[in-house]
Amino acid sequence: MLKGRNLLDPMDFSLEELEEVFKLADEIIEEPEKFLHVCDGKILATLFYEPSTRTRFSFEAAMLRLGGQVIGFSEPNSSSVAKGESVADTIRTVGCYADIAAMRHPKEGAPAIAAMYSDIPVINAGDGSHQHPTQTLTDLLTIRSLKGDLSNLTIGCCGDLKFGRTVHSLVKALSRYKNNKFVFMSPEELKIPDYIRKEILEKNNIEYKEISKMEDAMAELDILYMTRVQRERFFNEDDYVRLKDSYILDGEKMKYAKKDMMVLHPLPRVNEIAYEIDQDPRGCYFKQAKYGMYVRMALIAKLLGVR
């Protein structure tokens, strides 16, 4: 039973609970008209302390398509945060008006702090370079829907693996399924963090390798998860400029890939995936964005206990 729970980390739900959410998402995709009023009278608060397009719109569209309503902010300067209000006080106040909250914050752990003080379910919509569990649910539903399984996969993660919270969450989640292995492709400065390598992979004897050339791994990958180098995570503009074009996926590199490989990307894209890949059936990132709305619909319905 997920009613009243928080989602702060992809490990918060068991595999059985994740499957509950995915099966409900399947039902919503199949017959969306059946869910048009399940959240009548319910309100979602979107508390976005960082810019967002897909995640915020996806949450808002999800709640509206369930018949609920949305309040919130997408720019903290337009709220009492600008006056110095704490996360704890913000969530306490929002809990007086809303039934569930989605929070994005630049500081790692901020949604967890909010959950400690909240009387309503809190969903982590991304905290700094830490975790992004609803993007992970999106990624898992996309893979499950298009591949048919979440096990026995070779997953390549490419780009900014140090600051890329979507990668951290995805590796944690996919490490729970059988016989998955990982290939990490990044500049030396943007390698996967030690805590992922040691606490998730090595501790659980999960096979992985780190390489520098994308072409060296393309032929073995079932999934290629691309990420952008995130300008907003750099303190030094010169470092960003030097690293931003490190890995670019184009048609030439795709020649090495399996015919049924999937290219995923949490978006936004800058230049790390050439536009020619949009016409390749293996480019699944816009399908992935749509699955994000459906999985958030299912998650909201489950946490509110309306399904």
Curated annotation (Swiss-Prot):
Its EC number is 2.1.3.2. Gene3D superfamilies: Aspartate/ornithine carbamoyltransferase. The keyword Transferase applies. InterPro entries: Asp/Orn_carbamoyltranf_P-bd (IPR006132), Asp/Orn_carbamoylTrfase (IPR006130), Asp/Orn_carbamoylTrfase_sf (IPR036901), Asp_carbamoyltransf (IPR002082), Asp_carbamoyltransf_Asp/Orn-bd (IPR006131). Carbamoyl phosphate binds at R54, T55, R104, H132, Q135, L267, P268. It is an enzyme of class 2 (transferase). It catalyses: carbamoyl phosphate + L-aspartate = N-carbamoyl-L-aspartate + phosphate + H(+). Pathway: Pyrimidine metabolism; UMP biosynthesis via de novo pathway; (S)-dihydroorotate from bicarbonate: step 2/3. One of its GO terms (biological process) is 'de novo' UMP biosynthetic process. The keyword Transferase applies. L-aspartate binds at K83, R165, R228. GO terms for molecular function: amino acid binding; aspartate carbamoyltransferase activity. GO terms for cellular component: cytoplasm. Belongs to the aspartate/ornithine carbamoyltransferase superfamily. ATCase family. Catalyzes the condensation of carbamoyl phosphate and aspartate to form carbamoyl aspartate and inorganic phosphate, the committed step in the de novo pyrimidine nucleotide biosynthesis pathway. Heterododecamer (2C3:3R2) of six catalytic PyrB chains organized as two trimers (C3), and six regulatory PyrI chains organized as three dimers (R2). This is Aspartate carbamoyltransferase catalytic subunit. The lineage of its organism: Bacteria, Bacillati, Bacillota, Clostridia, Eubacteriales. The gene is pyrB.
